[in-house]
Amino acid sequence: MGPKRRQLTFREKSRIIQEVEENPDLRKGEIARRFNIPPSTLSTILKNKRAILASERKYGVASTCRKTNKLSPYDKLEGLLIAWFQQIRAAGLPVKGIILKEKALRIAEELGMDDFTASNGWLDRFRRRHGVVACSGVTRSRARSSAPRAPAAPAGPATVPSEGSGGSTPGWHTREEQPPSVAEGYASQDVFSATETSLWYDFLSDQASGLWGGDGPARQATQRLSVLLCANADGSEKLPPLVAGKSAKPRAGQGGLPCDYTANSKGGVTTQALAKYLKALDTRMAAESRRVLLLAGRLAAQSLDTSGLRHVQLAFFPPGTVHPLERGVVQQVKGHYRQAMLLKAMAALEGQDPSGLQLGLVEALHFVAAAWQAVEPSDIATCFREAGFGGGLNATITTSFKSEGEEEEEEEEEEEEEEEEEGEGEEEEEEEEEGEEEGGEGEEEGEEEVEEEGEVDDSDEEEEESSSEGLEAEDWAQGVVEASGGFGGYSVQEEAQFPTLHFLEGGEDSDSDSDEEEDDEEEDEEDEDEEDDEDGDEVPVPSFGEAMAYFAMVKRYLTSFPIDDRVQSHILHLEHDLVHVTRKNHARQAGVRGLGHQS
């Protein structure tokens, strides 16, 4: 079995050519075995000797990696980037992979290359094409990001002890499937949420983390900052960040520190620091005569004492819940912070100023404050809406909240009511069936009376049919509202197939009873006018399928809002009753029309 085929670099091919020229008396087969290549490959290399040597001179150091003359689709961009890279390295300054990517994006913008993204895969291929050696701690591999990664986030957020468990916080009960329920009755500007994240700094000055000739092993960046971010649901208030680190609190300059800073041995937000933060927030809310709800997650608050808080109610997300600010806000803050560091590094490299690569704690705090300020309020409100908290200015959270005991009692009551309703429904059905049988026997006897009284009774039948069989939208909407205890004042206009739906507050009159009486009088007048026509037009009766399709549309609209299980149960009961009534009325009306044709 011959040697395994592999593609040689230009440097390896040049070395083979040199070996052949230095040993003219050596057989070609012996040289092929020495380099573990087939004789045919050796013949091809010698045939293309001039082109191979030219390519080696062209690519220089990169010839140790390049195997073909195939150009990159971004060849012009990479030419400018490698020239800039060589200039910076000649000055003895380190260049990290993230800085290479940022510089490449700038060059692409100048060249108008909108499709260029500077991905990790491109960076890996760029290094291979141009012989850029990745030292430890810089561009690690194709599958890993070049930026340093913070440690894994701590375990799930703390849960609040129930009332009587010894905790100082009142007995909030939060359920994983309905985390916004605790915010019922609060305006969106009074619902705050806080989360903790990590940022890194002081890794730009690591001289050993350079590319292409780094002097020794790289030192991992160990300077980590824990940042507590807090904002309200409509994004109108972003509280100053609380930053914690291991370094001692720096001296404030003339303008002071841009955000609060606390130091401890672990570099995280401690219970004491959080208590002080909440106390300051409570004092501020007292001065503004406001009572707010603060939803927290991933905080060191298991043993937090909140007995002194009068204007701030604290609650926690259950484990496994995605925090509102973690739906995009935290990522934005990290992106703005990283961008600020890269811009600083780029300016230092292009100005060949090694001292510019030093990032101190005070400057890092300014970067944190600027990154938090750059987040748009609309983005914060969007993340809260995605988490189920509504959003928008002056909006009110209307989701329901009940304790476990209340929910169990309501479930038991609902089960008892359902059993009673089922029993009553069966009795009513039996009575109605008996009445229908008696009515069917008496219809033939009273047929002559119907003919004598005639058209007035027919108009009454048609009026009853239109009100019960037609299933008007206002009656359906009002019935659903009464069953659910009242929705908000929603009004939806359907332009095409369906009539206008007005969902009013439970117990509210639509336009007063006088309007309904006027409508009834107008219908009576129209029926009397139709009596003069011997071939009077019959009121069209919707089919059972049409009626149920209409109800399905209304049901979809109702269930698109956040409703509790009790309202859902009422909707199901209403659907059952409507099916029963519609079938009965449809059968009765068909029987009346059949008797009319026979007479």
Swiss-Prot record:
Molecular function as annotated in GO: chromatin binding; DNA binding
Low complexity compositional bias, start-end: 144-158
PROSITE patterns: HTH_CENPB, HTH_PSQ
Family annotation (InterPro entries): CenpB_C, CenT-Element_Derived, DDE_SF_endonuclease_dom, Dimerisation_CENP-B_sf, Homeodomain-like_sf, HTH_CenpB_DNA-bd_dom, HTH_Psq
Pfam families to which the protein is assigned, alphabetical: CENP-B_dimeris, CENP-B_N, DDE_1, HTH_Tnp_Tc5
Biased composition annotated in UniProt, kind: Acidic residues: 405-475, 506-538
Subcellular localization, as worded in the UniProt entry: Nucleus; Chromosome, Centromere
UniProt keyword list: ADP-ribosylation, Centromere, Chromosome, DNA-binding, Isopeptide bond, Methylation, Nucleus, Phosphoprotein, Ubl conjugation
Function comment: Interacts with centromeric heterochromatin in chromosomes and binds to a specific 17 bp subset of alphoid satellite DNA, called the CENP-B box. May organize arrays of centromere satellite DNA into a higher-order structure which then directs centromere formation and kinetochore assembly in mammalian chromosomes.
Protein name: Major centromere autoantigen B
